[in-house]
């Protein structure tokens, strides 16, 4: 009997001996027959875009970035284009910070928050268009680092111009040192802990840190790691800028930047498997494969 509807086809396929059917989990597919089914499928995709490692501020950003991404996928826009555009918004934010003054700093903080929201759109567009790639992940990382460098330089210049004292230039040097050291340490950590899956670094790090609750260094890092996330930082800057407390935010940034890289270096050495163990594992795998031949 010839199937005339999708429902009949779905029912008759398992009865055909020439076709193998596999059960697919409900959350991985959606049959769309009506406009209501389409809305249900879109909501399922929205939930799929939320990462397990997303914190409160990241989920708040998703409420804005996901609708934006849904509009972007209607056009020939690639995830890498979104990453570069987001960096441009970040550079504009840094320029307003560098100009100094209350309103300019407040506008810079607002643009910083906009860049943070758009920072989620490149990954969302990549997933919705099935265009995820290692290059895209690394480009996003480079754009994130460049954004931070521009932002920190802008904050340093702005505080120096506003205060008229060279002390902030010294603080700015310490801030840039901490930021660069943190970028290098995190890059090394990403290579050691998440080689081949760089987007999983945070999840891997959290899993390792939570498995050692008695380690005070890791406990401290795990409880405060949300502070250095890009999603939290812009909200904090906006609050400090709103109350004209950017000098406090600047000093806290100097301290935070010089706490990240020691924790990253320590955890990358503590969590990474010894090289000798990797060699032994590869040798055992070769011996096992040779025994099968």
PLM region spans:
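Membrane-embedded alpha-helical segments that form the functional core of polytopic membrane enzymes
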Residues: 79-135
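Glycine-rich adenosyl-nucleotide cofactor-binding module
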Residues: 48-88, 103
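Short amphipathic alpha-helical coupling elements at transmembrane boundaries
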Residues: 66-74, 123, 127, 137, ...
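Alpha-helical transmembrane segments of multipass membrane proteins
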Residues: 71, 91-95, 235-239
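Membrane-interface starts of transmembrane alpha-helices
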Residues: 78, 82, 103-104, 136, ...
């Amino acid at each position: 009997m010839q199937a005339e509807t999708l429902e009949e086809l779905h029912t008759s396929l398992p009865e055909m001996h020439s076709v193998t059917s596999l059960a697919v989990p409900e959350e991985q597919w959606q049959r769309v027959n009506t406009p209501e089914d389409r809305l249900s499928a879109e909501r399922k995709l929205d939930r799929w875009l939320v990462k397990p490692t997303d914190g409160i501020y990241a989920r708040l950003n998703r409420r804005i970035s996901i609708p934006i991404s849904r509009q972007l996928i209607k056009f020939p826009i690639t995830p890498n284009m979104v990453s570069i555009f987001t960096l441009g918004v970040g550079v504009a934010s840094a320029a307003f910070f560098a100009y100094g003054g209350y309103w300019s700093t407040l506008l810079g903080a607002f643009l910083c928050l906009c860049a943070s929201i758009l920072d989620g759109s490149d990954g969302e567009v990549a997933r919705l268009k099935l265009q995820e790639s290692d290059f895209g992940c690394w480009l996003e990382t480079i754009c994130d680092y460049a954004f931070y460098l521009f932002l920190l330089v802008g904050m340093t210049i702005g505080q120096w111009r506003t205060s008229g004292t060279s002390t902030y230039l010294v603080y700015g040097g310490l801030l840039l040192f901490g930021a660069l050291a943190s970028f290098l340490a995190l890059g090394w950590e990403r290579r050691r802990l998440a080689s081949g899956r760089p987007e999983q670094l945070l999840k891997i790090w959290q899993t390792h840190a939570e498995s050692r609750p008695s380690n005070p260094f890791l406990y401290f890092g795990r409880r405060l790691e949300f502070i250095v996330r890009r999603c939290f930082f812009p909200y904090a800057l906006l609050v400090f800028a709103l109350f004209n407390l950017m000098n406090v935010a600047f000093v806290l940034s100097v301290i935070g930047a010089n706490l990240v890289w020691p924790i990253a270096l320590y955890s990358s050495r503590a969590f990474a498997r010894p090289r000798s163990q990797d060699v032994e594992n590869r040798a055992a795998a070769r011996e096992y494969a040779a025994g099968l031949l």
